[in-house]
């Protein structure tokens, strides 16, 4: 599907094409296209836009490359940006997906293959406040601004959950290590995904600021977004350090529990050695063992074996080993 946002008079209107057979209508001379959003476009739709506006649309392989030259490039007439945006999958898991932004003749082209809330919001804002958006640079600046705000909300929620997890680790009487490790892993994955997304957007915004195609007002607004990005990158580092600290604490507690178990088995083994030795001696059944012929030899042997078990346990108890 192709959504086209056109400035018409004092308003911005949206026209949608749902089929590759449709063609972009011939607009009046006073009409001005601001934004063409390609949502899950077919190859025919991509080719049509590419040929109509003389765009070099990156392939799927080029979109996923991580080199700086593949994430941002600029020529005499256009700017191309491939950058990560977080999206929630059908399994409600957050992951990064590449969105392509192309700027040519002050028109913004976006190519995406998933539904992003930020695009729904920006479309409503564009239609509601047409005076704010003069060209594609204003649009891309607003898109990054809204996405960074959402990233900040995600990090704030992650930090809150991290603090709650830390309290549970210290205060819980009975610790479910499997559950806590699973939650810890989930928080670490979220933090890394947000960090990767922030790093990628920061590279893109830094490159736009160096471009002579963006005017002073656009650069001023994007600079504010960049400052917010830098703050969030620092926040992810702090949050990751807190998560690493929790992981260390959990690992130490697991080791302590394992050591307690090993110590218990060691004490039991040592405590059972004397009675085992006694039982082994009197189980040899040699003829010249007068104790075996006593009437009370069996109860005496049992008492000795019990006492030889109790004394080591008392000793270990005084030492604080059990």
UniProtKB/Swiss-Prot annotation:
InterPro entries for this protein: CorA_cytoplasmic_dom, CorA_MIT, CorA_TM1_TM2, Mg/Co-transport_prot_CorA, MgTranspt_CorA/ZnTranspt_ZntB
Originating species: Helicobacter hepaticus (strain ATCC 51449 / 3B1)
Disulfide bonds: none
Complex and partners: Homopentamer. In the absence of Mg(2+), interactions between subunits are weakened, and dimers, trimers and tetramers can be observed in vitro.
Gene: corA
PANTHER family per UniProt: MAGNESIUM TRANSPORT PROTEIN CORA
Annotated motif Probable selectivity filter, positions: 283-285
Origin organism lineage: Bacteria, Pseudomonadati, Campylobacterota, Epsilonproteobacteria, Campylobacterales
Membrane-protein topology: Multi-pass membrane protein
Molecular function GO labels: cobalt ion transmembrane transporter activity; magnesium ion transmembrane transporter activity; nickel cation transmembrane transporter activity
Keywords tagged on the record: Cell inner membrane, Cell membrane, Ion transport, Magnesium, Membrane, Transmembrane, Transmembrane helix, Transport
Entry's free-text remark on domains: The central ion permeation pathway is formed by the first transmembrane domain from each of the five subunits. Mg(2+) binding strengthens interactions between subunits and leads to the formation of a symmetrical homopentamer surrounding a closed ion permeation pathway. Low Mg(2+) concentrations trigger both a conformation change within each subunit and a loosening of the interactions between subunits. This results in an open ion conduction pathway. In addition, this results in a less symmetrical shape of the whole complex.
Family membership noted in the UniProt record: Belongs to the CorA metal ion transporter (MIT) (TC 1.A.35) family.
SUPFAM superfamilies linked: CorA soluble domain-like (SSF143865), Magnesium transport protein CorA, transmembrane region (SSF144083)
Residue spans crossing the bilayer: 264-284, 296-316
Reaction equation(s) it catalyzes: Mg(2+)(in) = Mg(2+)(out)
Essential for ion permeation (site feature) positions: 259
GO cellular component: plasma membrane
Task of the protein: Mediates influx of magnesium ions. Alternates between open and closed states. Activated by low cytoplasmic Mg(2+) levels. Inactive when cytoplasmic Mg(2+) levels are high.
This protein's name: Magnesium transport protein CorA
Localisation: Cell inner membrane
Matches recorded under Pfam families: CorA (PF01544)
